[in-house]
Amino acid sequence: MRLLCIGDVCGSLGCEKVRRVLPTLKRQEKIDVVIINGENSADNNGVTPFSADYLFACGADVITGGNHSFRNEEIRSYLDDNQFILRPSNLPEETNGRGYCLLDMGRYSVAVINLVGTIYLERLKASNPFLAADELIEKAENDGADIIVVDFHAEATSEKRALGFYLDGRVSAFFGTHTHIQTADNKILPKGTGYITDLGMTGVENSVLGVKTEIIINRLKSGDMSKFLQAEGECTLNGCIFEIDLAPRKTVETKRILI
């Protein structure tokens, strides 16, 4: 099974990049399942029903989220109604939506788990991602999942690597999101889990994490707190492909994507 995971899609330009690139990429790489992190897919940050529907129409099987998932209030009922758009599972219990889904692909099923880190993201009041992962992996196994995939939306590289090694051999693929910078460490961990610390982003290349460069420069240089605005220009799509052997449920190859 070939799994394509696409990094944080930024605004309408990022969505448009997915629309233009994904069909050809799926065909050329013989992709079976597509997971897209869409927590920044709306132009004003966050995700909306419109941007989620757009990504599903482009070919996403599952959309994952993160710390910006609830930036737009209208997404709350959408998260409750659509089981294939996720928000981090370890957010407080009263949070709308879910952080786990089971995708039925016919001859196999894929469980997708979405978690958020706790380092530098304390305001989210998220529970321990290690313990949450334990619970959700047990649920996936009880549900008969053939493959388990984790999107860990986290700030700290150390937290991502630690959870990746903790889950090695228990999940088929583990990828990080959130930083918008693709890491060059895609690998297969010792017990067979495909891993990358961060997928990167799908957004404007000449930007600061998808935001207009002058806004970020002015904030860092002089403390100007102007509103973040999406950058304009040519976009790149970042992601990673995991080829997973269904019998041992382990990754046999990883390939970074930068288009």
What is the role of each PLM region?
Residues 1-259:
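Acidic, metal/ion-coordinating pockets
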